[in-house]
């Protein structure tokens, strides 16, 4: 987002700080009149989901957002941002099989779904302060330098890629460039409020994702991760993050007039691989 706004010649204030307790907020924030606040902080979901890991995931999202909104409540009204854009996740929908999901679809079941529900509820409290609130229900972000793609590129590049379980589960994804542009659109377009799916319009299953990446890298993808092995090694994370199915439609984005730069998975891979 900072990159996108800087390209447009707009000033950006970056703040990296723990805001679970208001007293730890960067001192610049209360003194600065902000146009918008984009809140993307949170413990990584990667790793074994022990009880301690789940607690860190929850606190870094729900409790930190609660603390942030409380902190904004101490600001002078004229200094508060007019919009709070807060991260959420496509995990909001839970494991929904082949159901086609948009922003009006109800939440699902499971840890991630409950997390996203409470996370969004915490963000929406900022509406009481007169702020427009947007929640980003984000799929897997494909970018060259961060997230899952660099690891996937290495694994598939060695010819070790393969589908997860049956491969029939739907995988919401988005190119990092579209994610950044949609966040900027959420900041600047007043008609966007509430949840918005940050996912590409081309929904794909894990099997299709696997085949597409292998083809882009000119490598085979013969391997297959059995469900029982994934559950044994990763426990709850396997069912929710790797085997859960969300067939997500970015209805709010398309209804707002947004045109995706990378609407297809093959095109996204070509961009990331420099083809």
Where do the model's predicted regions map?
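NAD(P)H-binding glycine-rich loop region in Rossmannoid oxidoreductase-like domains
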Residues: 9, 15-67
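Non-catalytic, hydrophobic alpha-helical segments
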Residues: 37, 176-183, 198, 209, ...
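Conserved Rossmann-fold NAD(P)-dependent oxidoreductase catalytic core, especially the SDR/UDP-sugar
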Residues: 66-110
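Conserved beta-loop-beta element that borders a ligand/cofactor-binding pocket
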Residues: 88-89, 121-144
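Glycine-rich "substrate-gating" loop/helix at the edge of Rossmann-like oxidoreductase active sites
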Residues: 107-111, 139-146, 166-176
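Alpha-helical substrate-binding/gating segment
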Residues: 124, 153-161, 169-204
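Mid/C-terminal beta-alpha module of Rossmann-like enzyme folds, strongest
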Residues: 182, 189-236, 270-275
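C-terminal amphipathic/interface module of NAD(P)-dependent oxidoreductases
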Residues: 239-275
